Amino acid sequence: MITINSKEHILEQKYRPSSIDECILPAYDHETFKSLVSKGKLPHIILHSPSPGTGKTTVAKALCNDINAEMMFVNGSDCKIDFVRGPLTAFARSVSMEGKPKVIVIDEFDRSGLAESQRHLRTFMEEFSSNCSIIITANNIDGIIEPLRSRCRVIEFGRPTEEDKISMMKKMIHRMVEICKNENIEIADMKVVAALVKKNFPDFRRTIGQLDQYSSKGVLDAGILSIVTNDRGTVSDVIEAMKNKDIKQLRALAPKYAADYSWFIDKLVSECYDQVAPGKSIISLYEIAGENNKFHGLASNIELHVMYMLLQLTCELTWK
């Protein structure tokens, strides 16, 4: 069962997990957060992970939901000293009418220019700790001053074991399937879903974002799979033309591959490497391709630029 926020239309927001049980986490992290929830009240917490999209903000909100807290959510960049002294203090000082625990979530509080706010928050935490908890999310733990870290439970998460990775990807695939069912998105090829998850792991936010992007026509099929995996086949037609010194064919192929130069030159070098004679030809391959790549950004005509490289390779390479 997945949470659905019908007020949202962006899939990432519409299907944001609302509880720790729904969050896809490494086993140790899941147990840690469940233990915090079981106590009914939260300590001051810093959630940090260098990887984006691993669920820091989602976990912070889920913790609040699971203890039925009255939550105030603040973007870290807005949390200047005046905001701490004003709205944050007013919230922390007031008592919940329903007797709920109170939690302030400060998202991405590791941004530059917030040191003064962080210093003021030290005494803030001590003064209001009996009535209000603070959860801070951060990508860079060094962006949080040491005195603030010492007052919080610092939890680094998003470092799964190999066993965790397999389990988490399976859960994410299942979640993607549920989202597709609810959105009436046809999954013509399950490999697309698996490829999206594997490609973006552990950034599940990007995974959902790309699902949103690629499902705009209502179907996930083999065509989408080729885009996701960047599997555009081989450049064997170019290699055959070079082997045969077929200049006319190379001229016809140059426009086809010039559109995605970065992919083409990487693929060309990779496939040529396995087919050219060892020694001088391998050196020539890297010299010519490397020089061409170096000046790619300066070329006014990419098709001509690609054709020039192909002619050089045709003349210089010896094949097995």
From Swiss-Prot:
Protein family membership: Belongs to the Tevenvirinae sliding-clamp-loader large subunit family.
Subunit relationships: The sliding-clamp-loader consists of 4 large subunits and 1 small subunit. Interacts with the sliding clamp; this interaction allows the sliding-clamp-loader to open the sliding clamp. Part of the replicase complex that includes the DNA polymerase, the polymerase clamp, the clamp loader complex, the single-stranded DNA binding protein, the primase, the helicase and the helicase assembly factor.
Enzyme Commission number, as recorded: 3.6.4.-
Top-level enzyme category: hydrolase
Cross-referenced InterPro entries: AAA+_ATPase, ATPase_AAA_core, DNA_Rep/Repair_Clamp_Loader, Gp44_C, Gp44_lid, P-loop_NTPase, T4_Clamp_Loader_L
Protein name, entry field: Sliding-clamp-loader large subunit
GO-annotated biological processes: DNA repair; DNA-templated DNA replication; viral DNA genome replication
Gene behind this protein: 44
Entry binding sites for ATP: 12-15, 24, 53-58, 205
Keywords (A to Z) from UniProt: ATP-binding, DNA replication, DNA-binding, Hydrolase, Nucleotide-binding, Viral DNA replication
A GO molecular function held by the record: DNA clamp loader activity
Function (record text): Forms the sliding-clamp-loader together with the small subunit. Functions as an ATPase enzyme. The clamp loader holds the clamp in an open conformation and places it onto the DNA. 4 ATP molecules must bind to the sliding-clamp-loader before the latter can open the sliding clamp. ATP hydrolysis triggers the detachment of the sliding clamp from the sliding-clamp-loader, freeing the sliding clamp to track along DNA.
Record carries keyword Cell membrane: no
